[in-house]
Each structure stands twice: as C-alpha cells, then as structure tokens.
Amino acid sequence: MAKKNREKIKMISSAGTGHYYTTTKNKRNTPDKLKLKKYDPIIRKHILYNEGKIK
C-alpha cells in the first residue's frame, strides 16, 4: 500500500469569526504553511485564511 502524500488541513479565517475551509495539500511539494485569500461569508468579505491542523 502506498504512503499518502496529501494531508488534510483546515484553512482558518484570520478575522476571528470561526469560519474555516477544509482542503488537502501535498506535504512534500509544499512544506510551508499556506496563506490564501478566500471569502468569509460571516463578514461577507475576502480575507486572509491561514493553515491549521485538523484535530
């Protein structure tokens, strides 16, 4: 059985609303933490989302 290259991550809103997106990333190709601008429906704006671990 092959080892999984992609791990599940949680993209957490930097606005502190508690909203998050889940996605996967390749651990080998992107060892650094991700930062993406995505839409936060609670405050209805595009803001920065930071990578966090799924518990």
Curated annotation (Swiss-Prot):
Q: Which Gene3D superfamilies match?
A: Ribosomal protein L33
Biological process GO terms, please?
Answer: translation
Please tell me one Gene Ontology term that the record gives under cellular component: cytosolic large ribosomal subunit
Organism lineage string: Bacteria, Pseudomonadati, Pseudomonadota, Gammaproteobacteria, Enterobacterales
Keywords carried by this UniProt record: Ribonucleoprotein, Ribosomal protein
UniProt xrefs under HAMAP family: Ribosomal_bL33
Q: Entry's Pfam families?
A: Ribosomal_L33 (PF00471)
Name of protein:
Large ribosomal subunit protein bL33
- Entry's family note: Belongs to the bacterial ribosomal protein bL33 family.
The keyword Secreted belongs to this UniProt entry's keyword annotation: no
Q: Per the UniProt entry, what species is this protein from, by scientific name?
A: Buchnera aphidicola subsp. Schizaphis graminum (strain Sg)
- One annotated GO molecular function: structural constituent of ribosome
Q: Which InterPro entries match?
A: Ribosomal_bL33 (IPR001705), Ribosomal_bL33_sf (IPR038584), Ribosomal_zn-bd (IPR011332)
- Determine if Transferase is one of this entry's keywords: no
